[in-house]
Amino acid sequence: MAATRHNERDGLSDLRRDRQRKSGKMAPSPSKRKERSEDRAKDRGKEKAPGKEGTDKDRGRDKARKRRSASSGSSSSSRSRSSSSSSSSSGSSSGSSSGSSSSSASSRSGSSSSSRSSSSSSSSGSPSPSRRRHDNRRRSRSKSKQPKRDEKERKRRSPSPRPTKVHIGRLTRNVTKDHILEIFSTYGKIKMIDMPVDRYHPHLSKGYAYVEFEAPEEAEKALKHMDGGQIDGQEITASAVLTPWPMRAMPRRFSPPRRMLPPPPMWRRSPPRMRRRSRSPRRRSPVRRRSRSPARRRHRSRSSSNSSR
């Protein structure tokens, strides 16, 4: 009996130990829990630290890459830099998921910047064929327009004909055609003298005359000597008369003959409207005049009554 009891106690003690071991494995002490939580937090902090450093480095590299691509404008160099930066960023951030995402974003930004720089360099370097054609057309048009402008300028620059006609003003009424012919014939041959006459006094002039010389030099000579000179004691004026430009006859445009409209049909013709003359003239209201007859009659009646008395 004693041996059986001793065996039972040993078995119970073994069972308790097993339970204690299991309970120790399943539920550790609070001190051990704190230690384990601290260790885990440290491990996480260590893992996050290289990830953050990798993201900061990637951002700085992206900015530097963009500046370099904008300044240089070469697509090949930007592509090589983006590939090297993406490989280095992927190697440094292989332990963390955030590092891998940032490396992929940086590689995308690098590829987009390289594509933009390549497109800008290609657009600035060589113009499209459509633009070249447009520029060539503009140049050809400008070349064709130049000779026309030169012709217009030559026409404008052509010297105006020198005047041969002189206007003489402020003449007295005593001066005649013979006097002007005698004075101005000393400067050259005179073609014509025009001296308009007053309408109401045909033997008197209007106070001015036109003298036309054969050569423009003679007209200039007469202007020099006679402008401000005196005829019949009065100072006269002499000025050149510019000949008008010959007017070009405009070509007449013959208008087509107008077609005569056919007469309207009989049933559409309206009867001729005759002006109705009023047979009886308009009656005017008679002007009322004061009649003195009744007053005279009264006077007569009174006189007759007085005579009868």
Curated annotation (Swiss-Prot):
GO BP field: mRNA processing; RNA splicing
Compositional bias per record (Low complexity), positions renumbered to this chain: 70-129
GO molecular function, one term: RNA binding
Principal location: nucleus
Residue numbers spanned by region Disordered: 1-166, 249-309
Pfam families tied to this protein: RRM_1
Gene3D superfamilies (UniProt xref): 3.30.70.330
Keywords: Cytoplasm, mRNA processing, mRNA splicing, Nucleus, RNA-binding
The UniProt record lists the keyword 4Fe-4S: no
Keyword Cytoplasm carried by entry: yes
Cellular-component GO terms for this entry: cytoplasm; nuclear speck
Basic residues bias: start-end ranges: 130-146, 154-166, 270-302
Subcellular location per the Swiss-Prot or TrEMBL entry: Nucleus; Nucleus speckle; Cytoplasm
Composition bias, Basic and acidic residues: 1-17, 35-61
Domain RRM: 164-243
Function, in words: Component of a splicing-dependent multiprotein exon junction complex (EJC) deposited at splice junction on mRNAs. The EJC is a dynamic structure consisting of a few core proteins and several more peripheral nuclear and cytoplasmic associated factors that join the complex only transiently either during EJC assembly or during subsequent mRNA metabolism. Putative component of the spliceosome which enhances the formation of the ATP-dependent A complex of the spliceosome. May participate in mRNA 3'-end cleavage. Also mediates increase of mRNA abundance and translational efficiency.
Family statement: Belongs to the splicing factor SR family.
Assembly notes: Component of the active spliceosome.
Protein name, as recorded: RNA-binding protein with serine-rich domain 1
